[in-house]
Amino acid sequence: MGKSVVILGAQWGDEGKGKIVDLLTDRVKYVVRYQGGHNAGHTLIINGEKTVLRLIPSGMLHPNVTCLIGNGVVVSPEALMKEMGELESRGIKVRERLLISEACPLILPYHVAMDHAREAALGKKAIGTTGRGIGPAYEDKVARRGLRVGDLFNKEAFAEKLKNILEYYNFQLVNYYKVEPVDYQKTLDDVMAIADVITGMVADITTILDTARKNGEHILFEGAQGTMLDIDHGTYPYVTSSNTTAGGVATGSGFGPRNLDYVLGIIKAYCTRVGGGPFTTELFDDVGAEIARKGNEFGAVTGRPRRCGWFDAVAIRRAIQLNSISGFCMTKLDVLDGFDEVKICVAYKMPNGEIVEYAPLAAKDWEGVEPIYETLPGWKENTFRITDVNKLPQNCINYIKRIEEVTGVPIDILSTGPDRVETMILREPFAA
């Protein structure tokens, strides 16, 4: 019987989802992206070769897998063609194995221009977007003025819609933000030059998935960013513009929610965050700097340094609630090697003295929050590339077990290095 498994970030993104998607892809027929855009950098290291995929599902490196981009994904034609070109130059057949929903909103140059203009205007209060036009494209979707992949089939109608929407954007860019307008003809010409390639990959994603389920095929849904960046449930307004939680699978692909069998939450052995927003366990000392150095904590897309802190079970409990997480995959366990002690945040002390075990929702409610830590003995032994759980140091095993206890969710997969072979599968998600 076929299983449908969701892989998503249970923290603030950058948890190592790409590697785990790639690891489990040899079990499946389809890998599906259901939200986000090319703001998500999924890094894969296979036999020492590094690949960063931003828009195309990570399953593309497996020749027998079909990759689907669902309606919840915002698609930049330029970014898509660039990524396709990079993969095809390595002999990977993309357009024969990539299918796209016609309902995907398009990201066009005016979205990027607006993204940059807004962040510049906000100055120090900037949200910290990737500047790739993701938010403005989602805005257009909700406002029902956006252009979609399906609009590329009718080039005359597309040109007229583009003209109208550019008038709307250029008025704001010029008169409010005092920046240069976006050129209509260049935008139109650039999109039309690649329109036929994109429309050639359009398919009914919902029907494909439903048929696969009925035929007993395994399906893997690949999330982007992380739970605490969800537009509705994250640390608003320091969030992304899509639903990064498991509910986004149904709305972003058209796959019925009752058909999901297992949700794998990816967690680092510590926490990181990029950009602004609350981060209760953030470390500003030498320990934080050492975690960042050992973990090579720089964004795959932006290159920005990530903020680092101890493992936050309070935020994770909220992620468990929001996603119905079946099991965890813990990544970067080896980064904690060598520390005298390691800490787990088990509760928050609110400004009024109240002790809470679940993270607040809005960013404003995190102000003045203090972490309450449990301190455990660290381990000096090297766990890098260990693939036998029985060979892990006892203090490391104790740390893992304690995280399972304070969260109530089993750790089903352990990752001890960037390559997909440097992994221990303790419970198989597709057999759970």
Curated annotation (Swiss-Prot):
Coarse class of the protein's main subcellular location: cytoplasm
InterPro entries for this protein: Adenylosuccin_syn_GTP-bd, Adenylosuccin_syn_Lys_AS, Adenylosuccinate_synth_dom1, Adenylosuccinate_synth_dom2, Adenylosuccinate_synth_dom3, Adenylosuccinate_synthetase, P-loop_NTPase
Location in the cell: Cytoplasm
Binding residues annotated for IMP, in chain numbering: D14, E15, G16, K17, N39, A40, G41, H42, T130, R144, Q225, T240, R304
Named cofactor requirement(s): Mg(2+)
Details of cofactor binding: Binds 1 Mg(2+) ion per subunit.
Residues of the active site: D14 (proton acceptor), H42 (proton donor)
GO process terms (BP): 'de novo' AMP biosynthetic process; IMP metabolic process
Residues the record lists as binding GTP: 13-19, 41-43, 306, 332-334, 415-417
Enzyme class: ligase
GO MF annotation: an example: adenylosuccinate synthase activity
Protein residues bound to substrate: A300, V301, T302, G303, R304, P305, R306
Annotated pathway: Purine metabolism; AMP biosynthesis via de novo pathway; AMP from IMP: step 1/2
EC number: 6.3.4.4
SMART domains given in the database record: Adenylsucc_synt
Family assignment from sequence similarity: Belongs to the adenylosuccinate synthetase family.
Subunit-level organization: Homodimer.
HAMAP family found in the cross-reference section: Adenylosucc_synth
Protein name: Adenylosuccinate synthetase
Organism: Haemophilus influenzae (strain ATCC 51907 / DSM 11121 / KW20 / Rd)
Gene behind the chain: purA
